[in-house]
UniProtKB/Swiss-Prot annotation:
GO terms for biological process: translational termination. The keyword S-adenosyl-L-methionine does not apply. Its main location: cytoplasm. It comes from Pelodictyon phaeoclathratiforme (strain DSM 5477 / BU-1). NCBIfam families: frr. One of its GO terms (cellular component) is cytoplasm. It comes from the Bacteria. Belongs to the RRF family. This is Ribosome-recycling factor. Keywords: Cytoplasm, Protein biosynthesis.
Amino acid sequence: MSVREVYQKIEPRMKKTIEAFQHEIASIRTGKATTALLDRVKVEAYGQQMPLKQVGNISVLDVHTLIVQIWDKSMVSATERAIRDANLGLNPAADGQNIRVSIPPLTEERRKEFVKLTKKFGEDSKVSLRNLRRDMIQEIEKLEKSKAISEDDKNKGKKDADEMLHKFEKQLTELIVHKEKEIMEV
């Protein structure tokens, strides 16, 4: 194994960390209606917990309203209850086979809570990135100990690991700042 192979093994894992962070913050309310708000909602359907996406179609009606079109009419009340119980501060209202979900404006206090949550998710992701960098450096050091690479290659590999970490941390910081602006926008 070479330093390049170690790099190629770790880089996709760092990308996945960024993608996971993006998915995580997509469900944080910003005051605007997005279908991602309901991604984590689970509905008690047919004797099991199912993601909301599997019992109906979610779409944005306007800036402050989502519409959930339920495929099975018997699931309307369970879906409405699941949205209400998801602790998202949303108020669903059944309308035939559809559920209208009004997105109330966020209070200043709630916005600050969401910013804090975004920063927490960001810090957790940064820790994951640093752990991946550590793993990369450990693998490079093992290669050097087994004489598979030279000391110069080891040092270059460590430098590459630091640069890769810096690149992904910068990307993460930009995502955090963007989400904070989105949340604080009134």
